[in-house]
A protein has these predicted regions:
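PLP-dependent amino-acid enzyme catalytic core
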Residues: 1-381
Length: 381
């Protein structure tokens, strides 16, 4: 069922995302006792190495009809980067090579579109800072669905071209992402489309958990001591935490409680600023950063991201544009991984968290790299 994150009321698994009683966000609830019977380590050993090996924990009734090959990206032991960061052990979860559009958004889109098809939708739309637009355009093309993507008009040229090439209708809006998203929320019910991050958001967001599932399995079911996650809406961070907790509930992973940390760009850091101020709410901001994929000034999951970081003993930090570029360069030179600006935010913020002692130097950390540097060449030219 869909369940309100505030009052707990349940709703059918339909194209809806807000509780009618208190306007709280809806998320998918599962029958873990039932899942425990089929999702075992033995069963997993016989399944294809994609995110869909964990299908019981993803909200699609049947087999995935979109993005069946998405996920199971490398988890790389990054010894040289660990030395640059000043920590004993570092791992890089590299979604810069995710299929088909080189970002973690292929995970969430695969789930959202597979569920949209089950609900009978033929047209899909989204509001995007770039990577989501690319993924929706590519995956709808392969599935034979129509698509509309709404983006801020000043996005990186590469990301705009990467959406146009698939034949999607790309609509540039003068304004920042939050203004684009508000427009999409207004028209979501008007045309009968599946908006992946509006009326399909509860299903879309669940796809992010697959990153946590893979990290745990790739570490031989030992959950990492620390995970650093870039934050735009904050959803990736909250869902990685949910994924870890689900594996503990099912007895698949050790019951250690991993600490989850957030990373933002200084030019758009409402969640990080609230955390540093000791508040459980954030103030919306107007984004001004080269990390355009993280440029969400009114983060939908900001409140819940703050809650997760506090509950797990985590922290948050932010980095300037120059620090983002330096961190991108460090990851490339140390490990041969060219990340987009969001990855520079993750690596740069991790370095600050380690230097400040928030992540102890004798511990181990996983860094979530969410997109490919070929998409943000403008930032390093």
């Amino acid at each position: 069922a869909l369940k309100c994150r505030e009052c707990g009321r349940e709703y059918p698994l339909e194209a809806t995302h807000v509780c009618e009683f208190d306007f709280g966000p809806l998320e998918v609830a599962y029958d873990y006792d039932k899942i425990k019977k089929t999702l075992t380590k033995d069963a997993l050993s016989k399944r294809p190495q994609t995110m869909w090996r964990f299908r019981e924990l993803l909200p699609v009734a049947g087999e995935p009809t979109v993005g069946a090959s998405v996920g199971y990206t490398p988890l790389i032991k990054a010894d040289r980067l660990a030395k640059w960061l000043g920590i004993k052990e570092a791992w890089v979860k590299n979604d810069a090579v995710n299929y088909p559009t080189l970002s973690f958004k292929d995970r969430v889109v695969s789930v959202a579109l597979s569920r949209a098809r089950e609900l009978g939708f033929n047209t899909v739309a989204c509001a995007s800072t770039g990577n989501l637009a690319n993924s929706v355009a590519a995956n709808t093309a392969s599935a034979g669905l129509d698509s509309f993507v709404f983006i801020p008009a000043d996005l990186e040229k590469g990301k705009i071209l990467n959406s146009l090439i698939y034949g999607s209708r790309v609509v540039g809006i003068k304004g920042h992402y939050d203004e684009v998203n508000r427009l999409c929320a207004e028209i979501a019910g008007k045309y009968g489309w599946a908006f992946v991050n509006v009326n399909m958001r509860p299903y879309y967001a669940e796809g992010s958990k697959s990153m946590a599932f893979e990290i745990a399995e790739q570490l031989n079911w030992k959950l990492p001591q620390h995970t650093v996650v870039p934050m735009a809406s904050g959803s990736l961070l909250t869902k990685i935490h949910k994924g870890y907790q689900e594996l503990i509930k099912l007895g698949l992973a050790n019951d250690s409680q991993p600490t989850v940390h957030g990373a933002q760009a200084t030019g758009c850091s409402p969640i990080s600023a609230a955390f540093k101020d000791g508040k459980d709410f954030f103030k919306p901001v107007k984004p001004n950063t080269i990390a355009k994929s993280l440029a969400i000034g009114t983060p939908a999951d900001g409140f819940y991201a703050l809650k997760v970081m506090k509950e797990t003993g985590g922290a948050s930090d932010d980095v300037t544009d120059d620090e983002i570029r330096d961190a991108m360069k460090a990851l490339a030179e140390c490990e041969g991984i060219f990340t987009e600006t969001a990855g520079g935010v993750t690596v740069g913020a991790a370095k600050k968290l380690i230097a400040s002692g928030k992540i102890p130097a004798e511990d181990s950390v996983v860094l979530c790299i969410t997109g490919n540097g070929l998409k943000t060449l403008d930032a390093v030219q």
